[in-house]
């Protein structure tokens, strides 16, 4: 939920960059209970509801963020928009970044799963495919104009290998990016690194300077 970044103190973790004027954070609610997490629901309806949410982010939330950066922070313009999330939020962050690299100049994704099979099982249609990064990036054409954006922007995908982590699709993306010469930093942390906030704080602090430099 949108309040998790504050309630679980991720906002406090990012405070040095916020207070120094390098970072502005907008935490946006998801529709996970209606979409990815409602595994007993109609997948045809759920994926279309998810697509509506993505377009809300791109068409409404990002323009609102640009407005707020001027109204609240006095910035002339946003230097860039980074998609950031943990767990299923990381899944959304990677999907947003890869689908709209002309809007999102970077990505920080911690402990996500990057195939739509996680939420939609064996159901497949065009929209499910479009929201399954392992699938669409595996077949992504070399001559697509987004390739230049991917190769000139900064994205980090990180996953631990300890309790409750599911790193398999992170490994898949790593191999796909390497084969396509896309310099996403895909980083697998150790077997002691679990799927929980205490590790996400450490990872955010570790990667944020790279993302912002």
Describe each model-derived feature in a short phrase.
Residues 1-213:
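Non-catalytic cap/lid and distal C-terminal segments of serine-dependent acyl enzymes
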């Amino acid at each position: 939920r949108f309040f998790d970044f504050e309630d679980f103190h991720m906002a406090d973790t990012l405070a040095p960059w916020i207070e120094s004027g390098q970072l502005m954070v907008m935490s946006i609610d998801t529709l996970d209970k209606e979409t990815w997490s409602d595994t007993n629901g109609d997948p045809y309806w759920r994926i279309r509801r998810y697509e509506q949410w993505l377009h809300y982010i791109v068409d409404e939330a990002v323009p609102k963020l640009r407005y707020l950066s001027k109204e609240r922070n006095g910035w002339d313009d946003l230097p860039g928009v980074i998609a950031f999330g943990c767990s299923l939020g990381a899944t959304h962050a990677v999907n947003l970044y890869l689908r709209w690299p002309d809007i999102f100049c970077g990505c920080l994704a911690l402990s996500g799963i990057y195939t739509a099979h996680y939420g939609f099982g064996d159901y497949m249609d065009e929209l499910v495919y479009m929201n399954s990064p392992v699938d669409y990036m595996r077949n992504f054409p070399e001559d697509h104009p987004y390739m230049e954006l991917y190769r000139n922007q900064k994205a980090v995908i990180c996953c631990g290998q300890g309790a409750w982590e599911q790193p398999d699709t992170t490994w898949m993306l790593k191999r796909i990016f390497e084969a396509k010469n896309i310099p996403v930093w895909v980083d697998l942390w150790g077997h002691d690194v679990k799927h929980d906030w205490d590790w996400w704080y450490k990872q955010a602090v570790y990667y944020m300077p790279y993302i912002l430099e």
